[in-house]
Curated annotation (Swiss-Prot):
Protein name per UniProt: Methylenetetrahydrofolate--tRNA-(uracil-5-)-methyltransferase TrmFO
EC supergroup of this enzyme: transferase
SUPFAM superfamilies, A to Z: FAD/NAD(P)-binding domain
UniProt keyword terms in alphabetical order: Cytoplasm, FAD, Flavoprotein, Methyltransferase, NAD, NADP, Transferase, tRNA processing
Cell compartment(s), UniProt: Cytoplasm
Enzymatic reactions: uridine(54) in tRNA + (6R)-5,10-methylene-5,6,7,8-tetrahydrofolate + NADH + H(+) = 5-methyluridine(54) in tRNA + (6S)-5,6,7,8-tetrahydrofolate + NAD(+); uridine(54) in tRNA + (6R)-5,10-methylene-5,6,7,8-tetrahydrofolate + NADPH + H(+) = 5-methyluridine(54) in tRNA + (6S)-5,6,7,8-tetrahydrofolate + NADP(+)
Amino acid sequence: MAESLHIVGAGMAGSEAAWQAAEMGVPVVLHEMRPKVGTFAHRTGQFAEMVCSNSFRSDDDERNAVGLLHWEMRAARGLIMEMAAAHRLPAGGALAVDRDPFAESVTGRLRAHPLISVVEEEVADLPSSGNWIVATGPLTSSALAESLRALTGAEALAFFDAIAPIVYAETIDMEVAWRQSRYDKGETEDERTAYINCPMNREQYEAFIDALLAAEKTEFHEGETAGYFDGCLPIEVMAERGRETLRHGPMKPVGLTNSHRPEEKAHAVVQLRRDNKLGTLYNIVGFQTKMKYGAQTAVFKMIPGLENASFARLGGIHRNTFLNSPTLLDDRMRLKLRPNIRFAGQVTGVEGYVESAAMGLLAGRMAAAEILGRDLPPPPPETAMGALVTHITGGAEAKSFQPMNVNFGLFPPIDARGGRRGRKDRYKAYTDRAKAAFTEWLGA
């Protein structure tokens, strides 16, 4: 039998890496410290637990980079995308999932695989021998982070992710709010009415901004710096950047018509997205926050339609630790100083559930191929996975390296006409080129 592959962390990346390697015939030992050692953000001991949003974002594989990444992961028979499809919720053009059954299904499939064994323990040191993938995610334990610093001589970088609150659907006033996906996107009625919308006029919006700015915030611990990933900024930080920032961001009113008062144009709109299959829970889209709990309740109840809302979960912040990957990793995602160790997921400096799982997919396949005596190069940079791994392992500037979502700006340019119509054609050209290149890579 082949040598074993040890994987540290059973989040999105570790779970996908374990599945891919085991499916290639390599025995996997999956190390997960939960539930014995918990974190601020996790609630369970399940694998691939979604601690922030329940959305994998756009599922458009023709004109959206993350949708293309979905396509590539499906083509590679990814476990995360398979389980996401099994627990999909209506969300317009987005791919949202019922988070608890999703995590339970991922956990069940991995535990049932004959080549995967699970060890519930914390790994505190970077091993000097054996085959390893470290996929510890944004909440890498202090002991392991210290081990990494000692080995590399480099400081792990840190920023903070904020978590959005979740509301009980029955407590939303539907005489004020209405159901509609932006621009009525979706093929079914469920998808076209996937979001609950709460309108604000100018006076309500201005009062809301004042309350956000005045609210008491959570303080950082000594020695921590308040850096954020732009894709997960707390709403109060966005408000500090300008009073109009929110209504051009998560509170933008475009593409929505109030079904109660169609003649009235809202100044701003707060959207809530279904968080479970039963439709009993909704999360407030883009409303991640570091306000203290008491302040959150008061401020969020200023939103029309949420005056009597009850919260299943309030928002919060958690630390996110990641490597300076362009300096530390080679193009096979191996640690240059100790090539028996690969890294995958958010700890490498990608941001997002799908991006993390995709890096796990690559790391798992690359590690398994190496154990089996083969070399597996990364996908071409024209693909979504290839563009991401190229970015984190050398395409990005090391001095200014920050976590990155997949986007077409990471892809090699394509020759296509500009303009509004041209932009859509250009995105389609990117995805057509990527699909052909990825299919060829899979078959090599």
